[in-house]
């Protein structure tokens, strides 16, 4: 069932709303920003079945330098809330992949991750120093990167957030990573060399393939949808290439 903008009507979680506003503000800074039409059955999804309540809202845009800007907000059974965001660059431009995920169970943030992941060989040399200068010293519960996490930069940030101060600091880190992304995108020029473009395409394909190894994504969705729907959603909405 389709719904109106759920983030305007149902979502009340202050942390997710703060992050969402920040991401949207940075997205609005991009040139030639336009929305992308996706199958409406995969855009806004809502169920009021008792014990299996859920809503999923997706936003899709593209802009100069970016082939897809995706934001997903989801709530499952009134206690599991997820904010997922990936900005996929246009392979013609030498821009990293921005990714951010927040998983909140009741009031506990079990996972908070943000990164600018390399989308070409040695690309990280252009921005790793900038990421390393972002202060992350206040976090007490850093988490181990999963085995498939070789796609991330050396400065990927992954933690559980225990205190309110850590939640505020995570918003700051996301803001600074996004600001670095915007600066990089403003400097990027379109490439014409087909081999270089193909290398960037291959990097994005590998990014998506590795992300799909995260079994937690499908485990949550399979509680509400059949396997065919889940596979299509993951490959079409979350990690297409």
From Swiss-Prot:
UniProt KW keywords: Oxidoreductase
Keyword Nucleotide-binding applies: no
Enzyme Commission number(s) from the entry: 1.3.7.5
Pfam families: Fe_bilin_red
The keyword Cytoplasm belongs to this UniProt entry's keyword annotation: no
Gene3D superfamilies per the UniProt record, alphabetical: 3.40.1500.20
Signal sequence residues: none
Catalytic activity of the protein: (2R,3Z)-phycocyanobilin + 4 oxidized [2Fe-2S]-[ferredoxin] = biliverdin IXalpha + 4 reduced [2Fe-2S]-[ferredoxin] + 4 H(+)
Enzyme class: oxidoreductase
Any single GO BP term: phytochromobilin biosynthetic process
A Gene Ontology molecular function term of the record: phycocyanobilin:ferredoxin oxidoreductase activity
HAMAP family linked: Ferredoxin_bilin_red
Cited function: Catalyzes the four-electron reduction of biliverdin IX-alpha (2-electron reduction at both the A and D rings); the reaction proceeds via an isolatable 2-electron intermediate, 181,182-dihydrobiliverdin.
Protein name listed in UniProt: Phycocyanobilin:ferredoxin oxidoreductase
Organism field: Prochlorococcus marinus (strain MIT 9215)
């Amino acid at each position: 069932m389709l719904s109106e903008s759920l983030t305007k009507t149902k979502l009340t979680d202050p942390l997710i709303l703060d992050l969402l506003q920040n991401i949207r503000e940075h997205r609005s800074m991009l040139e030639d920003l336009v929305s992308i039409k996706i199958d409406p059955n995969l855009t806004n999804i809502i169920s009021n079945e008792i014990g299996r309540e859920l809503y999923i809202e997706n936003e899709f845009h593209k802009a100069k330098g970016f082939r897809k800007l995706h934001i997903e907000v989801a709530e499952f059974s009134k206690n599991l809330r997820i904010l997922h965001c990936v900005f996929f660059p246009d392979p013609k431009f030498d821009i990293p992949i921005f990714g951010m995920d927040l998983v909140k169970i009741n009031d506990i943030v079990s996972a908070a991750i943000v990164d600018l992941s390399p989308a070409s060989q040695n690309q990280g040399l252009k921005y790793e120093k900038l990421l390393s200068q972002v202060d992350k010293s206040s976090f007490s519960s850093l988490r181990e990167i999963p085995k498939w996490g070789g796609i991330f930069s050396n400065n990927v940030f992954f933690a559980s957030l225990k205190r309110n101060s850590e939640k505020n600091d995570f918003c700051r880190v996301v803001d600074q990573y996004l600001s670095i992304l915007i600066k990089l995108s403003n400097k990027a020029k379109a490439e014409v060399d087909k081999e270089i473009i193909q290398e960037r395409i291959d990097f994005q394909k590998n990014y998506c393939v590795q992300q799909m190894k995260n079994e937690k994504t499908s485990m949550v969705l399979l509680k509400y949808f059949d396997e065919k729907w889940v596979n299509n959603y993951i490959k079409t909405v979350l990690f297409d290439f």
